Amino acid sequence: SFLSCREQDGAQLLSRITQKEVKCVLDPTLLLSAKEWGKYCEFEIPKEPYILVYFLGEKSEHRRAVEKIQKLTNWKIISLPAAYLEMENNDYKKVWGGPKEFLSLIRGAALICTDSFHGTMFSINFQRNFFSFCKSSDSEESSENSRLYSALNIFGLSNRIIHNMDNLTAEDISIDYKNVIPILEEQRRD
């Protein structure tokens, strides 16, 4: 029998419990290419650059981080309201929708700010600039952060997790995907 897990910590735990090798594998959302997911992107998106905000949690410091990024870029903010955080300025738009809107907005965003694991994975798949935020503290028993850390470490993108906004500059926004894509393709083959 074959055992696999989406995160390194989980794979190690299962391996200790079962005394079997447990392989760390890609999240299923990454098994399809951006082109394949693109078939579902039928929602019309804005022409000008925008920051897509998709937060499942309700941390006010995340809101403040997005506002700082918005000031650095002057890009409009579009929010997919899961647990919507009201922005202090009026330079945003809420968008309600389903999977097509979600995928279209991620694919078209200049930058994604999210605390969603899958928001992060789709950002990588569509080769978008993104910042990931942790929904909970690493010390919380219900923390899901290890899954995010594990995935970002595989792609060499652990620097995309925002812990401290103090030194963030506009140059920190861009991601060079030239080293990420070969890793993603190799992981798909595995």
Regions found by a protein language model. Name each.
Residues 1-190:
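Active-site anion-handling motifs in enzyme catalytic cores
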